[in-house]
Amino acid sequence: MGMNNEKTVILFSGGLDSTTALYWAKKKFSAVLAMIVNYSQRHSIETEMAQQVAKNLDVEAHLISFPLKNIVYSALIDKDKKIPGSLETSKNAEGVPITYVPFRNGIFLSLAAAFAESRKIYHIVTGFNLIDSPDYPDTTETFTKKMEDAINQGTSASITGNTFKIHTPLIGKSKKEIIRMGLELGADYSYSISCYRGKEIPCLKCPSCDIRDNAFKQLNMEDPLITRLKKEGKR
């Protein structure tokens, strides 16, 4: 993978996908700025771990507070809503996952674009992938391209000729493939948090835990997060 002698901003949640994307960005760009968004999500431990991962990699991290709890409704934000226990029970009557946060990725990309534009950075990296979450409308290639077009039209890029590029290195990959890619890049997943219930110790029951657990089993290896928790006596 050739090094791009430019900077990039990465939308970094601290989850497994964005951790893989962070390692990819470190190999691809000369400097990486991690934008970590606290949007009043239930799994706020993710932002704490995200800052730890960024520190471990000597990546400049920026924690952005942008609460969505008074704007949107989602089981990932509203603690009174029940987190689904399986993929089969994870959708509402309209077929939309109850863990979908309305237009979250659109909001985050807008924040990232403003953040990047202010620093004259024209690359944005995301950990979006579609195969494991096909019913999330804001993770598709079409959505990402439309957002890229909107950013290029609605920022100074339309005047200066500088062009924003949104990178989606995980699009089209399964969770197993994402983990394998990360391991090849030297990724440490021991601090990556995926559980929807908002605890460092995963429940191993929610859809996110289920997908992650199955992926590591397919690779015949223990989840590095579980390994770390065992060593620390937390599990």
Predicted regions and their residues:
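Secondary-structure transition/capping residues
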Residues: 123, 158, 189, 217-220
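ATP-dependent adenylation/nucleotidyltransferase module used to activate substrates
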Residues: 2-185
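Iron-sulfur (Fe-S) cluster-binding segments and ferredoxin-like electron-carrier domains
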Residues: 201-230
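Immediate flanking context of iron-sulfur cluster ligation sites
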Residues: 184-204
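Short, Lys/Arg-enriched, disordered terminal segments
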Residues: 1-6, 231-235
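Alpha-helix boundary/capping detector
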Residues: 141-142, 150, 208-209, 232-235
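Iron-sulfur (Fe-S) cluster-binding modules
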Residues: 29, 37, 225, 231-235
